[in-house]
Amino acid sequence: MKRIVGRLLLLLLLVSCDNHKPTKLIILLVGDQMRPDHLSRFESLYTGGFKWLLENSVVFDSAYQQHGYTVTGPGHFAIGTGIYPGPGGVLGNEYFDRELGRVVNCVEDPKAHPVGGVGTARSITRYKTKGIGDMIKDADPKSKVFSIGGKDRAAIFLGGQNPDIALYYNNRDRFISSTFYTDSLPEWVNEYNDNMNLKAYKDSMWNKILPDSFYIKYSRQDYFNGEVDFYHDDEHDLNDNTDKKKNIYNPVFPISFDKGVDPGKEFLDTPWFDEKLFGLSEITIKNAKLGSDNHPDLLCIGVSTMDYILHNYGPYSQEAMDYFLRLDIVLGRFINYLDQQVGLEYIEFILSSDHGGLPIPEYLPSLGMEGGRVSREHLKEAYEWINDEISEIYGDNLFVRSGAKFYFNHERLRKNNISLDKPAQVIKKYLSKVDGISAVLTKDEILASKEKDAITIRLKNMVHPEKSADVFALIKEGYLYRSSYGTSHGSPYDYDTHVPLLFAREGRKYHHINHHAETVDIVPTILDILNIQTEINLHGKILPIK
């Protein structure tokens, strides 16, 4: 009897192993300014891609970008490499480069040229850190890696050092690349670009896809002070033959392009862009034959549009809600296409975001939070006082300021035997008086700190020992540098660092895990899924998804 039971158990084990399909394709979806509640608040309304992802996923409820400057470049870098952005040298979307003596774009490449259309050549040439795609290719040179994004830095940091290609929107009418990656675009990409026909959208109107009652229940009223209003044609003077706009503040649906605006230049700001982004992703899967063999492939997709919409209207707006409902539909079509082209049983999906975001400050009281907008005038005044006093005591040009970050001339400090602490105290004296500034810190103070709280850890993970600013201001919780309208991100606080993170696969039981996870955990977890070993000292850990 025991022998029979043993044989039955062995048979069940073999059947189980036979049903475990190999992973042929990794789909890495990265939102921009997406918060976890964009999944949870609208979960009952989702019918497409988000619904499928959630129903077949393990969701990490306590997932964070564990670094202190939460913007697009560093966030995508952390996801794509498994390395914190500070040690990796990705100090922001733009930052002061001490060697060059100027502010640089994080993915600029002066030696490269645009490929496929007019635009700016970008690449990862400033960094040597390998990405997840490089690690996959190191293990299997026949694997293919494609990275596509609305923003250049999204596509580039997700793609790593050696993708087959990185494609990004040129803010005109096409997806382009640079000579760092290729000398020419594949013909199917050129054909797709030629057929996008963005000018046809010039009269398109963004309307809600559900009745008003749903938006009142799941978001807030449409007109809300603090939202950005770019569209003014709805209230211009119809009797004015010059069609001169009155620019009346009216941030409500419907939304469209103002008269005379080239749709291509603002297309990334609209929900229609996602249709083009995932359309390009579909033809990439087909023409590059991704997932067609047993050499695992990677497709990274940077969903950049949501950042523009959330900057303009905030995470609780009707516009944000409608955007995610529309993206749900687009994702649903994309997942259906993948099922037909590859088979969902062979695909691992990962969804996360480069950072979260603060609700519009004017809405914070409704959430029981305090906040506001730092006065540009007060900041300007403080900067002038700082410059005047430091120049008077130590001479001109002792530092370079980039935003609220101060880079000192270390050679002059050493030559004149000046301790950095002394001019730093001048900066602290004036900036600490500005309403909305929580603290003024030095790089050395952060690195020397023994504190183990989340804020200190995140600040440390954003520091590069040589390249980072010497002194910088830490904004107060709930405050923005952005003035007048809209919202933003960039702080080390939970509303900016807390991001969605899920791993989805057909048949996986939907469940939530509440223990701490980080975006740098994505790379080692993908490697574990693919049974790939790496000698790289990754900052992340393998997450329990099986």
What do the predicted segments below correspond to?
Residues 1-22:
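Bacterial Sec-dependent N-terminal signal peptides
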Residues 18-58:
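Active-site-proximal N-terminal segment of extracellular/periplasmic enzymes that hydrolyze or transfer
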Residues 52, 129, 133-137, 403-440, ...:
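Non-catalytic, well-ordered alpha-helical segments in soluble enzyme domains
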Residues 61-80, 147-157, 302-304, 353-356, ...:
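Short, solvent-exposed turn/loop segments enriched in Gly/Ser/Thr/Pro and often Arg
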Residues 62, 93-119, 161, 173, ...:
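Secreted, luminal/periplasmic, and some membrane-associated catalytic domains
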Residues 84, 92-295, 304-311, 435-436:
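His/Asp/Glu-rich, glycine-adjacent segments
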Residues 267-293, 306-347, 424-430:
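A long, amphipathic alpha-helix that forms part
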Residues 377-418, 488-530, 544-546:
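Substrate-binding rim/cap in mid-to-C-terminal beta-strand-loop elements of soluble/periplasmic
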